Amino acid sequence: EVGQHQMWSAQFYKYKSPRQFLTSGGLGTMGYGLGASLGAKCAFPEKTVINIAGDGGFRMNMNELATASRNNIPIIEIIINNSVLGMVRQWQTLFYGKRYSNTVLDDGVDFVKLAEALGCVGYRAETKEEFSKALSTALTLNKPVVIDCRIGKDENVYPMVAPGEAISKAFDASDMK
């Protein structure tokens, strides 16, 4: 996966051992995560496999939930859903004068109903408490689960590097004031 959710996952999840974080890095592979998580679960059936995706990336290959259900592959898909292409919108905010173009995903797709229609379990979380409860329950199930986590469209991730700049020029939110 690629996007804000990828950076948050790298920054804030406490990994306990090597090879727990499968990532494409910054190669722009939206939608990579769901298929990769199915492969990881098949390779290591004894491991808990969780994919963290943005709602834009999830839409790229959401049909793979049918594969998970049909083949009884119990992965957990956490969707960080801000109803926009978050990283693209953040760049448009910071570097293009808030000229937003083609980033809004407000077509009303209900990821919980989609999960259920494809034979998976679906939960929606709008608070930390709802997320904790959904994740705790998902970890006890032996079936594919989708957790649709709603966040605000203006949540940004830092540090950030401007287009064409070197990594040494990375900046944080505090630099924006």
Where are these regions (language model features)?
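Active-site diphosphate/adenylate-binding microenvironment
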Residues: 1-35, 40
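Short gly/pro/ser/thr-enriched loop/turn and capping motifs at secondary-structure boundaries
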Residues: 6-7, 28-30, 58-59, 83-87, ...
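Short acidic, glycine/serine/threonine-rich loops at helix termini
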Residues: 8-14, 33-35, 62-64, 87-92, ...
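A short acidic, glycine-rich active-site loop
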Residues: 23-29, 97-106, 170-177
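Conserved thiamine diphosphate
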Residues: 43-134
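Glycine/aspartate-rich loop-and-adjacent alpha/beta segment that forms the canonical ThDP
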Residues: 128-177
